[in-house]
Amino acid sequence: MKGSLIVAGCFAGGFIAGRLAEYSPEWLHTASLWLLYLLMLQVGMGIGSDPKVKEMLRTLTPVSLLLPLTTVAGALILTYPVAFMLKAVCVTDSLAINSVCGYYSLSSIMLSQLKEPLVGATLAAKIGAVALLANVVRELIALTGAPLIARHCGKEAVIAAAGVTSVDVCLPAIRRWCGERYVGLALVHGTVIDIASPFMLTLFASL
């Protein structure tokens, strides 16, 4: 929860600074690109050095892969009616935003970089902001709504709602409201989405 609020605060501060600035400095694009590279490096190092990887591999079965696949499929299917109702972001960009299932840091930076050559810096920044806010809100809902989701929708639904954060931020909530036996499934779920997110986002952003 605290981490999500810090992210939202940083976004608000950056937005205000951008509005007050008379122009966007040339180094900003280069800096954000290198931040993206460092983020991808951190993702790989985080997965490789995680001591829970062995536990995850022990619980890895073909059946356990169905949950992340279902999570992503559900997010993409629900994108269509929401995108048509809101009309703020086109369907393909909405698919890119939802395909990462809560990975706000990756989606905001990477989507802005991918869309800038296609739609310009201003619109790309707006799309990145929508990606950030949408995925932060998803994480907050998963954290605060975990007990209700577990009670009315089932334990697996808590993991699905957490999306990629089932491997880190939402893991304590999953352990508390779902039980220890769901921890391994949560790790597999979050890691699979973590690995697949950059590829899915790139695919939909290029459409």
Which residues does each predicted region cover?
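Structural signature of multi-pass alpha-helical membrane transport proteins
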Residues: 1-56, 62, 69-85, 202-207
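Cytoplasmic-side transmembrane-helix entry/capping segments in multi-pass membrane proteins
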Residues: 2-5, 32-33, 58-70, 93-100, ...
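Small-residue-rich segments of transmembrane alpha-helices in multi-pass membrane proteins
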Residues: 10-15, 37-42, 64-77, 97-109, ...
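Helix-coil boundary and interhelical linker segments in multi-pass alpha-helical membrane proteins
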Residues: 19-24, 81-92, 113-130, 204-207
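Alpha-helical transmembrane segments and their lipid-water interface positions
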Residues: 36, 40, 142-146, 158, ...
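Entry/N-cap segments of selected transmembrane alpha helices
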Residues: 51-80, 127-140, 185-193
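Alpha-helical membrane segments and immediately flanking helix-loop junctions
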Residues: 92-141, 149, 153-188
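Long hydrophobic alpha-helical segments typical of transmembrane helices together
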Residues: 178-207
